[in-house]
């Protein structure tokens, strides 16, 4: 049933301070028909002027509510229609929720529906974060002519690497199960996060988290490698279909940041209009970190940027954004914004820091070092990886509820006390080192297992000893050559592998130390490898593996940072 209201926006959003505002028109719970007959439910908010206006579309799985939010109100007052829609299978929308496959067509159909309305001028933009950002990428794949610009926040553009698995093939078990439990659990069912992430086999962890079997989750479990299933749905694999201007926003401690930056780099050669902004944030940009503050300059007026962006592409008003460099990143350590023409910055150059020890790099008390000089000693380090006692995740780019699964920068010294964590550090720096770009660990490793994992974490060590995590990653050894074609290892054979440890922008200040942690688990950020060589998601039991890291003249294991000259 469609209802029409004429309300004073200032009364509907009493939390807003300031002068009296214009009245708006709102239609609540409007049915929007999809091509298969399923009806989605939308709220429509309009200016009172009887003219055709451009529209902002927000498609959400989190519930559109029964009224307008202060953020959406600002767009109506600025002359936009705002349409907020429950995606298929969520809240008041019909159908089954199939997030892997439904959003391209449903986004396309909703855009066409808006364009047909008497209040619409046919020009539409989309905005929102997380899943609400992902659906923007999906709608853009449709090539709908009415979609003129998108503004995805903390969303990424690849289902495999961002939402479910990772650049190294391990599953983001904590992220995925926590999101599912928050949003999809059966009514009245509850189990603690710390319990359901431990469930074995991983394939049936959906029941532990939700109280029911999720077809979506089971389908993901059937495709642990990057196969045709993922290629068919990945925006990353179809990025040439994205023809609209994109303003992407990410955070250095967000799960999607690497993908946000890669998307910009992929789009930029084809169009000079796209932009990317990355700050010192986690998945919720407005949530402060508990123990770390990056200063008042780290706060960005995102709504103002959105209004400028949509005024440019939906109303034809020239924006100051046009004359500014398209990349804006916050450099931690210096706590300053930096503008660039490209990502990665054109002036950044690889800096290799070689791992070395006397064979006792285990823990913070060990003898592991990082140096620009290649290792001279023929020593190696060993540790035992017991997946029943994994290295715990301590902050980082995790998602999506910090009360349950804490995110962001944290002191890593409790983790570095463990014997199954190898610690390599530089001497205190004699000058600042500005690292902006990808972080990689090139390692020469052997294992007693047919398959196992290796992790790498970049850490900024302060003069007082605080060890602040910057970024991290993992490699499932079977994917050492390719995510598409897994290959089991030969026990005790030495392999050269590259662990993709993400991206960062940080000045390691004079007197600080650069540190690299190497281990075989980071749980529950990533699932635990069973170390058997079998299907990890089906393993009912886990076994130990003995890991060896080589770093000598023949096996030059190293950390690779992209360093910007001028700070040294």
Residue ranges and their predicted role:
Residues 47-116, 163-166, 171, 287-294, ...:
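Cap/lid segment of the alpha/beta-hydrolase catalytic domain
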Residues 258-274:
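Active-site-adjacent alpha-helix of alpha/beta-hydrolase-fold enzymes
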Residues 18-50, 425-431, 444:
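N-terminal cap/lid segment of alpha/beta-hydrolase-fold proteins
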Residues 77, 138-241:
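Accessory cap/linker subdomain of secreted extracellular hydrolases
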Residues 118-131:
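Alpha/beta-hydrolase fold nucleophile elbow
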Residues 197-202, 277, 291-568:
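C-terminal, loop-rich substrate-recognition/catalytic regions characterized by aromatic stacking residues
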Residues 242, 248-250:
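Short beta-strand/loop motif that positions the catalytic acidic residue
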Residues 38-40, 47-56, 120, 241-242:
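Proline/glycine-enriched tight loop/beta-turn segments at coil->beta junctions
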């Amino acid at each position: 049933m469609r209802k029409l209201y004429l309300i004073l926006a200032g009364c509907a959003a009493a939390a807003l301070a300031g002068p009296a505002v214009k009245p708006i028109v709102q239609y609540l719970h409007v049915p929007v028909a999809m091509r298969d007959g399923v009806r989605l439910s939308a709220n429509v908010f309009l200016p009172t002027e009887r003219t055709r206006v451009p529209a902002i579309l927000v498609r959400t799985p989190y519930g559109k509510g029964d009224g307008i939010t202060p953020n959406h109100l600002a767009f109506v007052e600025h002359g936009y229609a705002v349409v907020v829609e429950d995606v298929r299978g969520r809240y008041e929308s019909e159908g089954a929720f199939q997030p892997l496959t439904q959003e391209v067509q449903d986004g396309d159909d909703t855009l066409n529906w808006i364009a047909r309305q008497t209040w619409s001028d046919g020009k539409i933009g989309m905005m929102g974060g997380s899943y609400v950002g992902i659906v923007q990428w999906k709608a853009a794949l449709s090539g709908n002519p009415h979609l003129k610009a998108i503004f995805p926040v903390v969303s990424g553009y690849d289902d495999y690497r961002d939402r479910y698995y990772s650049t190294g093939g391990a599953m983001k078990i904590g992220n995925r199960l926590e999101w599912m439990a928050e949003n999809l659990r059966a009514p009245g069912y509850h189990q603690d996060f710390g319990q359901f992430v431990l469930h074995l086999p991983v394939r049936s962890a959906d029941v532990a988290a939700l109280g029911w079997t999720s077809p979506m989750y089971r389908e993901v479990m059937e495709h642990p490698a990057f196969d045709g299933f993922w290629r068919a749905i990945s925006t990353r694999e179809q990025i040439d279909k994205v023809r609209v201007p994109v303003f992407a926003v990410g955070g250095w401690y967000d799960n999607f940041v690497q993908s946000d930056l890669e998307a910009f780099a992929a789009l930029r050669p084809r169009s000079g209009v796209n932009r990317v902004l990355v700050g010192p944030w986690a998945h919720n940009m407005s949530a402060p970190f508990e123990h770390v503050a990056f200063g008042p300059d780290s706060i960005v007026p995102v709504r103002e940027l959105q209004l400028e962006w949509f005024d440019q592409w939906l109303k034809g008003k020239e924006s100051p954004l046009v004359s500014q460099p398209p990349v804006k990143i916050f450099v931690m350590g210096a706590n300053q914004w930096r503008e660039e023409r490209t990502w990665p910055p054109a002036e950044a150059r690889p800096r290799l820091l070689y791992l070395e020890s006397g064979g006792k790099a285990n823990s913070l008390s060990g003898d592991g070092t990082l140096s620009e000089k290649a290792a001279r000693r023929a020593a190696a380090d060993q540790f035992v990886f017991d997946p029943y006692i994994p290295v715990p995740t301590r902050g980082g780019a995790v998602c999506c509820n910090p009360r349950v699964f804490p995110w962001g920068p944290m002191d890593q010294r409790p983790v570095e006390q463990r014997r199954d964590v190898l610690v390599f550090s530089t001497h205190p720096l004699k000058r600042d080192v500005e690292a902006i770009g990808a972080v990689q660990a090139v390692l020469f490793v052997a294992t007693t297992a047919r398959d196992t994992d290796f992790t790498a974490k970049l850490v900024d060590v302060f003069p007082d000893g605080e060890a602040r995590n910057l970024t991290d990653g993992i490699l499932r050894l079977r994917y050492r050559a390719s995510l598409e074609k897994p290959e089991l290892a030969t026990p005790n054979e030495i392999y050269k592998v590259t662990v993709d440890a993400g991206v960062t922008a940080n000045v390691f200040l004079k007197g600080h130390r650069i540190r690299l942690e190497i281990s075989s688990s980071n749980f529950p950020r990533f699932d635990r490898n069973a170390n058997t060589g079998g299907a990890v998601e089906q393993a009912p039991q886990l076994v130990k593996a003995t890991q060896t890291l080589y770093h000598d003249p023949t096996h030059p294991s190293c950390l690779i940072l992209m360093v910007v000259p001028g700070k040294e």
